[in-house]
Amino acid sequence: MKSTVYHPYHLVDPSPWPYVGACGALFITVGSVVYFHYSQTWVLLMGAITLSLTMIVWWRDVIREATFQGLHTMVVKQGLKYGMLLFILSEVLFFFSFFWAFFHSSIAPNIELGAVWPPQGINPLNPFSVPLLNTAVLLSSGATVTWAHHALISGKKTEAINGLTITVVLGLIFTGLQAMEYYEAPFAISDSVYGSTFFVATGFHGMHVIIGTTFLAVCLARLVYHQFTRHHHLGFEAASWYWHFVDVVWLFLYICIYWWGS
């Protein structure tokens, strides 16, 4: 059956994914409490699997609507851009709270910490070893994703694929180096407020790097399968915005926590 639409908006079909995703988030919340109190992980694992599968199939539907059904008009894409920018703004405020907690504790340390920062007994990481290498890796990935974006706009698909592949590899290298740093760290998350602020701030950033790497890997696969053109590549554009946000957050983490905080 053919139908004529007299407006530029996308009226989405009924979908079960918001409800299923909300259930997954509920399982994660309850599972976290169960894990902290009873060391049982099955509820948390079930929630994580449910939420992950929901994101996969939901975004698959979005890709189908955009690429194969042509439902993403210019007005719809503009709305998606605003949504991505607001999401990044919310992430900025999310990390702002971690920096607030860090500076609240470090600028005027309590007497319980020995009135010094880092607290007594804490041996901070050397900012000019692995953290500096990670900084170079992440900044290089920002340059390569920009190269890939400009290559795609110029119609140079091979260069875009190469640049995006290098970006994904650099993201994986960063994650590996961060895991090695955590494994060899001389303090834990329970070692005073320094350990808690350090691992929460850098840990959430590491999680965002993993999410961004996955985002870019999906864009790479879509680029290989000819789903992006020089004029229609909103998913890639959103992924590059997110990746640059991750770069900027890491610069603040390195300067404030690794260098100044040590």
UniProtKB/Swiss-Prot annotation:
Major subcellular location class: mitochondrion
GO MF, one example: cytochrome-c oxidase activity
Keyword Transmembrane helix: yes
Assembly information from the UniProt record: Component of the cytochrome c oxidase (complex IV, CIV), a multisubunit enzyme composed of a catalytic core of 3 subunits and several supernumerary subunits. The complex exists as a monomer or a dimer and forms supercomplexes (SCs) in the inner mitochondrial membrane with ubiquinol-cytochrome c oxidoreductase (cytochrome b-c1 complex, complex III, CIII).
Protein family according to the UniProt entry: Belongs to the cytochrome c oxidase subunit 3 family.
Protein name in the entry: Cytochrome c oxidase subunit 3
Highest classification ranks of the organism: Eukaryota, Metazoa, Cnidaria, Anthozoa, Hexacorallia
TM regions (residue ranges): 16-36, 39-59, 83-103, 128-148, 160-180, 198-218, 241-261
Keyword Membrane applies: yes
Catalytic reaction(s) noted: 4 Fe(II)-[cytochrome c] + O2 + 8 H(+)(in) = 4 Fe(III)-[cytochrome c] + 2 H2O + 4 H(+)(out)
Cellular localization per UniProt: Mitochondrion inner membrane
UniProt xrefs under SUPFAM superfamilies: Cytochrome c oxidase subunit III-like
Highest taxon listed in the record's lineage: Eukaryota
